[in-house]
Amino acid sequence: MVFGTIGFSFIEGKTIIDSAYFVVVTMATVGYGDVHPVTTPGKILAVVIIVMGVGTFLGVIANITEIMLAKREMESRMKKLNMVIGVFYSEVGLGLLASFSRYDPDFDSIRPDLIVNANWTDKDFLKANKGSLSYNYSVDILRVDLPALKNFLMEKRGFLLRLLENPVLLEHQSFTDLLRAVFHVTEELAYRNTFIDTPEADSNHLATDIKRAYHLLVSEWIAYMKYLKNNYPFLFSLAVRTNPFNKNASVVIEN
């Protein structure tokens, strides 16, 4: 714009205002209008401006198209990712959450903040997330039924391995960390043939591994519930009715 204005002012001998008007008319109408260059250099400059204007327009269109395609691709990946996350919680996550929270001596202090319902807003999910991040997760390892936990996770070992191999998860670091934490607990338990007379140091080690997975399970569950609330109301309804933290949860709709 500045280049064209100065050029026409110098070549055609027009005022700055007339030159600016000339540039706008030339670019907007691709050279067609009541104003046109008289001199040969002016005509050449007009052609240059037209070409630059068309090039800029095409560049803008290309950028907009690229942004739209990238957004659509991202939405598609997010749908696939959350479908995988949903399968994980259905097969493994909900059972672990119910078990770990049952053995958490202080869980009742945070439980009310995790009773998700249909009236929740983004503000409620934010509050729940902040609470989950600041909460000191723990499990009473002496109360945990380690043989039952081992059997449960060993049954799901193949499923967890397939999830870890899923390329869709490469773009979701926090969920990948969750899978690794759960799989690590699986391996720790798998290598132990008995849990009778377990040394205190070993019990504490297992408690730390479970705590790591427990914390990540809750955080990712909150994010997943928010996604369902905003995108899939029918799936969210079932998720609310199977909330592992709600002692009164029932899949049956009473009213």
Segments from the language model and where they lie:
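Short amphipathic alpha-helical coupling elements at transmembrane boundaries
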Residues: 22-25, 83, 87, 162
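Membrane-proximal, non-transmembrane interface segments of integral membrane proteins
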Residues: 71-151, 156
